[in-house]
Each structure stands twice: as structure tokens, then as C-alpha cells.
Amino acid sequence: MSSIKLIVGLANPGAEYAATRHNAGAWFVDRLADAYRQPLKEESKFFGYTSRLNLAGQDVRLLVPTTFMNLSGKAVAAMATFYRIQPDEILVAHDELDLLPGIAKLKLGGGHGGHNGLKDIISKLGNNPNFHRLRIGIGHPGDKSKVTGFVLGKPPTSEQTLIDDAIDEAVRCTEILMKEDMIKAMNRLHAFKPA
């Protein structure tokens, strides 16, 4: 059984960003909330939208920060402190440039890879990077100078379908993660091939 108590989906707030690649983490948390019929509600003390799920008999909180991406740690730290959740009990879902659309991978710890949301969370958790990550592939524009425009752009329909398929599989694997363990969830998710 997993000890995950908080699942966070990273995003920028506002309608203009809702469909951009940088919000892939929030798409995952939204899909998870829908799958368990527990809609997210805004909770200002946690600087985000929150919900509470019973996942495989365990109490799990969901959070989509309403801060901008580079301030995500404020929301994560507020919720973690309030509910006494340790970094290794947190799963952060985020967009990943180094994976292609249609691929999602789980990992524990590591650096921020230039991702401003992860950077701020690590900082606000007392420079502790040892939380779980769900990396949702969005692909790379091929040139470092194009990254900002790329992550703040909307994927074409063909890529969106691949990203959605990977997110749906990640939702299914979250149940495996909670019921069994990280290794089983990783094995299934990492073997996934989009149609």
C-alpha cells in the first residue's frame, strides 16, 4: 500500500491557461476528481482548488494551486503543513518536456529540471526534493529558446489525444499505486503505449 496523502496538479490559473501544455498536471487531478465524483472546490486558505477522495480505503487530498506556476510551493506547503503531510507522502503531477505526448512516468525525488513549479515546491518544503512525481509527457519544441512559448501554447488535437490517453492510464495506475505499491503502478504506467 502507498502512503500518498496529497496529490497535486500543477497549473497556471485562469481560463487563458486552462488548455495550455503547462497545465497537464491539473488535467490529471481534474480527471482523478471526476473519476471518483468528488469535484474540486476553491479553498482560499490552501491557495487552490481542493477535494478529498477515498482511494483504496485511504484518505487522499487533491490540490490544484490557484497561484501562478512559479509560486506553487505556497499552496503545497500550506496544505502539507495543515494536514501534517510529509514530502514523501506527496505526489506532484506536472508537464514534462523530456517525455513525448502519450507517455507518463512516476518517480520519487530528483531535481526540478528547470520546471518552475517543482523548483518552488522543493524550496517551500525546506529544500526537500523527496516527493513523488507524475511526469506527463508534452514533448519538446527542439530549441531551448522556444520552451516558454511551447509550454504556454495549446497542443494540436493529435497531441492532446495522446496526452489525454496517458492521463487516463495514470488515473487507472493511481488506484494500483494506492492499493498495492509504487513499483506495480510504475511497471504498468511505464509499459503503456497509446493507441
Swiss-Prot record:
Query: What gene does this protein come from?
Result: pth
* Record: residues binding tRNA: Y17, F68, N70, N116
Q: Where is this site: Discriminates between blocked and unblocked aminoacyl-tRNA?
A: N12
Say which species the protein is native to: Pectobacterium carotovorum subsp. carotovorum (strain PC1)
User: Under what name is this protein listed?
Assistant: Peptidyl-tRNA hydrolase
Q: Which reaction does it catalyse?
A: an N-acyl-L-alpha-aminoacyl-tRNA + H2O = an N-acyl-L-amino acid + a tRNA + H(+)
Function (record text): Hydrolyzes ribosome-free peptidyl-tRNAs (with 1 or more amino acids incorporated), which drop off the ribosome during protein synthesis, or as a result of ribosome stalling. Catalyzes the release of premature peptidyl moieties from peptidyl-tRNA molecules trapped in stalled 50S ribosomal subunits, and thus maintains levels of free tRNAs and 50S ribosomes.
Annotated InterPro entries: Pept_tRNA_hydro, Pept_tRNA_hydro_CS, Pept_tRNA_hydro_sf
The taxonomy runs: Bacteria, Pseudomonadati, Pseudomonadota, Gammaproteobacteria, Enterobacterales
Q: Which domain of life is it from?
A: Bacteria
Write out the GO cellular component annotations: cytoplasm
Instruction: Kindly give the CDD domains that the UniProt entry links to this protein.
Output: PTH (cd00462)
Localization, per the record, is: Cytoplasm
**Catalytic EC class:** hydrolase
Q: Where is this site: Stabilizes the basic form of H active site to accept a proton?
A: D95
Q: Which Gene3D superfamilies match?
A: Peptidyl-tRNA hydrolase
One GO MF term attached to the UniProt entry = tRNA binding
E.C. numbers? 3.1.1.29
Q: Which terms are listed as keywords in the entry?
A: Cytoplasm, Hydrolase, RNA-binding, tRNA-binding
* Similarity section: Belongs to the PTH family.
Q: Per UniProt, what is one Pfam family of this protein?
A: Pept_tRNA_hydro
Using the UniProt record, give the first listed, main subcellular location: cytoplasm
Q: How does it assemble?
A: Monomer.
Q: Where is the active site?
A: H22
Can you supply a Gene Ontology BP term from the record? rescue of stalled ribosome
Q: Which HAMAP family match?
A: Pept_tRNA_hydro_bact
Signal peptide (from-to): none
